[in-house]
Structure formats: structure tokens, C-alpha cells
Amino acid sequence: MAKLWQKENQSTDAKIEKFTIGHDPEYDLLLAHYDVIGSLAHIKMLASDSVKLLSQADQETLEKELKKILVDIEAGTFSIDAGMEDVHSQVEYLLTQKLGDVGKKIHAGRSRNDQVLVDLKLFMRAKIEEIAHSVSTLFDTLIKKSEAHQSDLIPGYTHLQIAMPSSFGLWFGAYAECLVEDAELLEAAFRLANKNPLGSGAGYGSSFPLNREMTTQLLGFEAPHVNVVNAQM
């Protein structure tokens, strides 16, 4: 199967392709859920009254098939075919196999660049939330331990010598405070990930009348990237 960027009458040596691809398909499967979620928002925007680049009938047809793919992803039965370039190509391939030319319309007004970026942003946002929840749970545990063991004494060392009395509670509390600082870093990372890159195209925007505010709201982003070049950085 020809790759998305493969030039006519040219092919890549199988060993080179295997080396460069590596474990990409495995990592791409992690993005599959978010790729479909991003596409659902994209086609809804394309069919909106402010854009009208997709008919309501085509939007409903695409949405139905995308949701079927989403069910397969969540069931763990979705896979990327051998020779398929990436998860984005796999999803489009399934749509065009089922819907013909209608399936190809999903790529209107969207570059592979901003499609990949929105997948990554959605993935990072979800994982940061998971980690933040785990950090919060561990913080609560350490604080309880700190309070429970505040009177359980241990020697405090400096320069390998006993210096002052300390306690298990003090040390549990120290690690709890470290987690507070980690949570602040996670919050900052979440804010950076919580910006919508859709509509930035390949880094220079789009000539289509895309509604970036709409996809921002549909995907739960705080705001779109203001500068389309920065969205790609």
C-alpha cells in the first residue's frame, strides 16, 4: 500500500522502513481514541452554519462510522494494518472503504500537522489529569501518615552524625509538600496542553472559513492557539 507521502514510482527499502517506523504503530494506538474524538469535533464544525463545508447528511454519515470505530477502539479490537502509515491513515482508510468519497471529506480544512497536534494535546491533557489524581491521592495518604506519626521520634542527621531529634511525621510531611509542588508543575503543563491547535493547518493557517472557537468548545480546550506558527512549535 502506498504511503501518504510516497513519491510516484519510488519505494523505500524494507529494512530502512522497519528501522524508521520502529514501535510507531504501538504508540499510535494510544492516540486512536483521541484521533476519533478530534475528527468528530472537526466534522461537526465543517457542517456548522458558520462554515458549511460539509453537508448535514455527510456529517451524520461520518459521525455514525466514526462512533463505530470508537467502539472498536474502546473494546480493544481496533488495529493498524501492516503497511499503514499511521493511526490517522487507518481511520481514513476505514471510512473510505465503508463510505467511498464521503470518507475522504473528513480531511477537508485540516492538515496532518494540526490533526496530530490535537491528538497529542488531548492525550497529554487526559494523562496529566490521571497523574494529578494519583498525586492527590498519595498526598492525602502522606498527610494522614504525617499526623499519625508526628510523635514517633527518629534521629535527625547532619554530616552523617546525629544532630537533633526529628520524627517520622516530619518526613512524611516533607514528601507531601514535595507533591504539592509537583501538582503545581502538572497544573502548568495542563494549561499548556489545554490549547486548541486545530485550524493552524501545516503551520500557516487555512484559507477555509474554519470556526476554531467551535472546535475549541467541542473539545473542551480553554482557548485556541492565537498564533498558528506557535501552535506547531
Language-model-detected regions and their locations in the chain:
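Amphipathic, heptad-repeat alpha-helical segments used for oligomerization and assembly
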Residues: 225-233
